[in-house]
Amino acid sequence: MNGMKNASVKDVMDVQIFRNCENIALVKGEIESDDLRLVLDMAKNLKNFRFLGTRVPSDFQHEKAFSIERIIYEDANWVRLENLLTMRNSTYVTLGTTSLTYSDFNKFLKFWVNSEADMFMELYIKMEENINPQVLFDRLLRLDLARFNPPSYFIISDSTIVDRKNPLLLVEHTNGMLKFFAFSRTRVWFRVNEDPNSSTEKKTFQSEFDALRILEKQAKLRKKMEGIENLDQDDMRRMEELDMQLNGLLAEGKFIIGE
């Protein structure tokens, strides 16, 4: 627009067409924290926000930074665990290198398990080192998938939460990115190099869903039985039934129980 070349961020955002933009991209250069906060405060219909080569102050924070449907933050050194926990119904989130630790990611996954709402569909975080599943999934029920290469892992939301449309989370590390995919048990999933017409039977993750629910029931039953000398016979029979169901799923599925 004429006359806007040397305008301040406030001058730009004072123009109604920019305040109503659904898509905003910051390309190269750097931006001050106050200016970035101003954009987030004034952009009322923002659905797609991108930092593309733009340097962001390490102390930047804003409550709306992760309440946007689609996000690409190439400079993500400012991102904290608390930011990730504010995601709700995002579809696509991509972050560059962060200062997040394994402990942060583990807390993030535990929060996802117990979240009342779906947080995201796809989340990508740049991380060069391969993941250590024993640390990343510490104290979380998980399955290790053999159907994919490189290794992939599954966790599930708590069964007491009924409003989650996508209760399954697939986690993997490929091409220097830590990737999280949330979806329903009936989602049909194909790799890029897989032929969706190669089989008449559609592949879903129903078996993985069922196996994780059984693991959850077993964990709750074991906790109930802890420290009891004379175990309830009904509980013991129930545990045996769950073992049989789980073994059947393990025999037919391409996954193992994560340890």
Q: Across the structure, where does each feature detected by a protein language model lie?
A:
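Non-core capping and flanking segments associated with repeat-based/extracellular domains
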Residues: 1-259
